[in-house]
């Protein structure tokens, strides 16, 4: 006996209009089951449990676990999960923590979900990719919904949004939260994301000037194997985006994939077709995410190095050769709030001439800036973590006119402060050798400093013991090798213009 879906099903969910009838029926039945399961949500908990959560949400969860006997009316496992989740949200998702009535999943899901700054960045990225018309006609499909943090921010840029998640525990939590957040245009589907992808209609080829609604598919493949161990290779993640690449590009105009920051983005470019953008996203100088944007048509590859309000972008030809340096002129314009990351508007060329794109042959003929041995540089520049991850060291030197200390240290020198440099800047106080007399003279009166080593034979701890310095303070020591000589650079932090 064949079960078929009636016309009302297709009217209810535009994404099902080209599905086979049996597939559409199964998907909608799963959606109905999830809607029924939401009865276990916070709205159905007794008053004693809700009051316990509200009263103790800032308390130590380990201590609260012993209060079960004294609170027999409290659903203690659920209450402890909510308190722990809210405490994590206060750190990772402050906007959610400030919203009463949200429900939180188990601890592991909270730790694995995106932070608020990175979710906002992806929302702004999606909005730029699909344009303003997506709010009236666009479709977002998140095939790996999870707790729904990324989905909840991205969905606001689309007329219709579909959340797909195979974990039957997470789906009702996500649906409850979406309702609390005012997302009334979303569909929840429980099941395998790959199966849902294969049931999606093919997206027609678009011609210039076409006004058809855009479809964007988002994936955050699970980076743990069946034994719970972390994996980092794309083929080891679930789902395998390398295997699905062709299928994804047949069913979406744009595909955004989130990968581990441990992955080499050059490897991703080699294994996946039609990557048009690579985003290396850091928060507070800690690399958090690697985002890939795939498009149906082949485009020049652009790399975005993002760290809070600092963004540096450049274009590469093929898989590795640079074409141009690019810089967003104003860091402040990248934010709509103090804590939000936003996708940059690209301004191509060198800072001195932002309107001109540097031709490929000209870029490779540019001599890297060098420092004269007789000149004493006044500023040391340290690239942020996204620059380090992207490996765009030549691009930085050419774009800002600064010189590298060495090809291995990835530290730069300048005769003055460099506006908009994507990293930290330090005023050089002294440069010394490792000679005992030179060290004694250079560090006279210095008892405390932060120490970093780059291409240097000693570890930071070993050097600290040798210099007999306490950790911390306002001074910074960078130990590196210049040519064949080991050097220590004593600095203090510089407020960049």
Please place each PLM-identified region on the residue numbering.
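SAM-dependent transferase fold signal centered on methyltransferase-like domains
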Residues: 5, 9-18, 22-497
């Amino acid at each position: 006996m064949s079960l078929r879906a009636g016309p009302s099903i297709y009217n209810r969910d535009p994404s099902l209009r080209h599905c086979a009838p049996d597939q559409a029926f199964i998907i909608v039945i799963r959606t109905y089951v999830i809607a029924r399961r939401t009865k276990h949500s916070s709205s159905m908990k007794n008053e004693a449990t809700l009051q316990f959560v509200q009263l103790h949400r800032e308390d130590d969860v380990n201590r609260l676990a012993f209060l079960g006997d004294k609170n027999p009316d409290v659903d203690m496992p659920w209450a402890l999960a909510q308190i722990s989740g809210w405490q994590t949200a206060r750190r990772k998702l402050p906007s959610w923590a400030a919203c009463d009535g949200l429900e939180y999943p188990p601890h592991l899901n909270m730790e694995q979900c995106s932070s608020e700054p990175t979710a906002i960045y992806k929302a702004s990225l999606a909005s730029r990719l699909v344009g303003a018309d997506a709010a009236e006609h666009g479709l977002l499909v998140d095939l790996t919904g999870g707790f729904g943090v990324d989905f909840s921010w991205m969905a606001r840029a689309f007329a219709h949004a579909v959340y797909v998640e195979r974990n039957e525990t997470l789906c009702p939590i996500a649906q409850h939260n979406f309702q609390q957040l005012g997302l009334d245009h979303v569909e929840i589907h429980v099941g395998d994301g790959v199966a849902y992808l294969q049931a999606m209609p093919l997206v027609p080829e678009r011609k210039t000037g076409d006004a058809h609604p855009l479809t964007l598919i988002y994936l955050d493949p699970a980076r743990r194997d069946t034994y719970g161990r972390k994996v980092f290779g794309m083929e080891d993640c679930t789902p395998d985006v390398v295997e699905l690449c062709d299928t994804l590009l047949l069913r979406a105009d744009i595909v955004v994939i989130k990968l581990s920051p441990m992955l080499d983005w050059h490897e991703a470019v080699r294994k996946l077709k039609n990557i048009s953008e690579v985003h290396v996203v850091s928060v507070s100088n800690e690399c958090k995410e690697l985002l890939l944007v795939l498009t149906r048509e082949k485009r020049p590859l652009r790399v975005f190095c993002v760290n809070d309000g600092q963004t540096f972008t450049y274009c590469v030809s093929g898989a590795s050769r640079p074409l141009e340096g690019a810089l967003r002129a104003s860091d402040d314009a990248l934010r709509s709030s103090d804590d939000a990351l936003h996708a940059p508007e690209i301004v191509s060329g060198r800072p001195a001439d932002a309107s001109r794109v540097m031709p490929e042959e000209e870029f490779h003929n540019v001599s890297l800036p060098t420092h004269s041995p007789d000149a004493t540089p006044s500023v040391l520049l340290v690239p942020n973590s996204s620059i380090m991850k992207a490996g765009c060291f030549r691009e930085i030197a050419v774009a800002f006119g600064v010189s590298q200390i060495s090809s291995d240290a990835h530290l730069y020198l300048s005769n003055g402060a460099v506006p908009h440099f994507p990293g930290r800047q330090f005023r050089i106080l002294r440069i010394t050798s490792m000679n005992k007399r030179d060290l004694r003279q250079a560090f006279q009166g210095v008892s405390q400093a932060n120490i970093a080593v780059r291409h240097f034979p000693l570890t930071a701890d070993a050097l600290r013991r040798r210099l007999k310095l306490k950790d911390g303070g306002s001074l910074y020591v960078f130990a590196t090798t210049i040519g064949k000589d080991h050097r220590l650079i004593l600095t203090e932090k510089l407020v960049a213009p």
